[in-house]
């Protein structure tokens, strides 16, 4: 396995969303948001459970009405992952979901009413130990900031965020995280850089409205990758016009690529050329689908020939190097066996699952020894 990247993370305070720590060196969490009608309890619960299965640490649910708040109560009872309620304009909805056990409130203090209503929500959050996320978005900047700056700028997003932060500071509430999202990569990145210098609270990263599954993943990888490589960010959401499950997968892929947080298999595969001795592309695509259930961190290299194959295999948990009719299988950098090219997928799946079980057992024993 490769060593972890030497990224020096920004120091921040810590909050808890349910039992999930955010900030102060805690693992960077990956979250998504449901896109069902919240009042359709069954559909929303099913989607949340699908997100749980692929590793979502936190799930956000839009709660636009009191009917949705009542549905939220039923949803919360049926899932295990911490839930964030996304609320705008009506402070009473925030108070209601707080009664029902919400794990975090996503609000902007400035758009839920006058100072007294803000105080009521914040006091409720304090009493019930519920953190708040301030969510600034370039597409919904306050009118006076639009007039002042002419268009969304990093300074405009920062000023908007600091207004909301000041609201909470005046009420002596510090259990919050902040996001300053934009669909433009450079706008979002610079906004987060400015904000990171101004506050100590955890930062929720995202490129909002990034696009479809492919283009949105690319934008998010660039924007979030830049920030994460600079040590900025404590939790993230990849926003895609796609199945929310894909947001979680891409989020973990970004963290794996930067070696910040490992979950599941990190496939290393060549783009193929005429030297390939077996169907690399078909093998990788099939294994990615078949092995989605494995959460054990592993590097698996699948290289079609001997040009780069042995070198990649040396630093992989398992590695395959293409050969004539049979390909070399490496384990922890040591050549162990040869696999039939015609039955590569099934053989390699079996070896990967066996290795994952071996690693899991070794970790279990290590934990038991530490506990003793």
Swiss-Prot record:
Keywords: 4Fe-4S, Iron, Iron-sulfur, Isoprene biosynthesis, Metal-binding, Oxidoreductase
Functional pathway: Isoprenoid biosynthesis; isopentenyl diphosphate biosynthesis via DXP pathway; isopentenyl diphosphate from 1-deoxy-D-xylulose 5-phosphate: step 5/6
Listed Gene3D superfamilies: Dihydropteroate synthase-like, Sulfite Reductase Hemoprotein, domain 1
GO molecular function annotations of the record: 4 iron, 4 sulfur cluster binding; 4-hydroxy-3-methylbut-2-en-1-yl diphosphate synthase activity (ferredoxin); 4-hydroxy-3-methylbut-2-enyl-diphosphate synthase activity (flavodoxin); iron ion binding
Family affiliation: Belongs to the IspG family.
NCBIfam families reported for this sequence: ispG_gcpE, PRK00366.1
PANTHER family referenced in this protein's UniProt entry, alphabetically: 4-HYDROXY-3-METHYLBUT-2-EN-1-YL DIPHOSPHATE SYNTHASE, 4-HYDROXY-3-METHYLBUT-2-EN-1-YL DIPHOSPHATE SYNTHASE (FERREDOXIN), CHLOROPLASTIC
Function: Converts 2C-methyl-D-erythritol 2,4-cyclodiphosphate (ME-2,4cPP) into 1-hydroxy-2-methyl-2-(E)-butenyl 4-diphosphate.
Record note on cofactor: Binds 1 [4Fe-4S] cluster.
Domain of life (superkingdom): Bacteria
EC number: 1.17.7.3
InterPro entries: Dihydropteroate_synth-like_sf, IspG_bac, IspG_bac-typ, NO2/SO3_Rdtase_4Fe4S_sf
Leading EC class: oxidoreductase
Pfam families associated with the record: GcpE
Residue sites binding [4Fe-4S] cluster per the record: 270, 273, 305, 312
Name by which UniProt lists this protein: 4-hydroxy-3-methylbut-2-en-1-yl diphosphate synthase (flavodoxin)
Gene this protein is translated from: ispG
């Amino acid at each position: 396995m490769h060593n972890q990247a030497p990224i020096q993370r920004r120091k921040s305070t810590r909050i808890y969303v349910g039992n999930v720590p955010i900030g102060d060196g805690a693992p960077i969490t990956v979250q998504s948001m449901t896109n069902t009608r919240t009042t359709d309890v069954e559909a929303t619960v099913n989607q949340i459970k699908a997100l749980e299965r692929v590793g979502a640490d936190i799930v956000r649910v839009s709660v636009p009405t009191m009917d949705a708040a009542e549905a939220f109560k039923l949803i919360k009872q049926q899932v295990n992952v911490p839930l964030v309620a996304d609320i705008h304009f009506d402070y009473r909805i925030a108070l209601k979901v707080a009664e029902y056990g919400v794990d975090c409130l996503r609000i902007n203090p400035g758009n839920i009413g006058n100072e007294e209503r803000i105080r009521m929500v914040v006091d409720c959050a304090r009493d019930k130990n519920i953190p708040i996320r301030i969510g600034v978005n370039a597409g919904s900047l306050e009118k006076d900031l639009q007039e002042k700056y002419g268009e969304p700028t990093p300074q405009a997003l920062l000023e908007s965020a600091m207004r909301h932060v000041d609201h909470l500071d005046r009420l002596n509430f510090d259990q919050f995280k902040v996001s300053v999202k934009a669909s433009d990569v450079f706008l979002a990145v610079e906004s987060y850089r400015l904000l990171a210098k101004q506050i100590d609270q955890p930062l929720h990263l995202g490129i909002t409205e990034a696009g479809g599954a492919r283009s949105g993943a690319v934008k998010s990888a660039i924007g979030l990758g830049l920030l994460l490589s600079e040590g900025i960010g404590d939790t993230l959401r990849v926003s895609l016009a796609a199945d929310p499950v894909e947001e979680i997968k891409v989020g973990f892929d970004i963290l794996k690529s930067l070696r910040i947080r490992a979950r599941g298999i990190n496939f290393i595969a060549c783009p193929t050329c005429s030297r390939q001795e077996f169907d690399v592309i078909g093998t990788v695509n099939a294994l990615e689908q078949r092995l989605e259930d494995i959460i054990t961190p592993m590097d698996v290299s699948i290289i079609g020939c001997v040009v780069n194959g042995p070198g990649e295999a040396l630093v992989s948990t398992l590695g395959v190097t293409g050969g004539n009719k049979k390909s070399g299988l490496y384990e922890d950098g040591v050549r162990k066996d040869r696999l039939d090219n015609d039955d590569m997928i099934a053989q390699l799946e079996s070896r990967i699952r066996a290795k994952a079980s071996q690693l899991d057992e070794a970790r279990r024993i290590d934990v038991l020894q530490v506990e003793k």
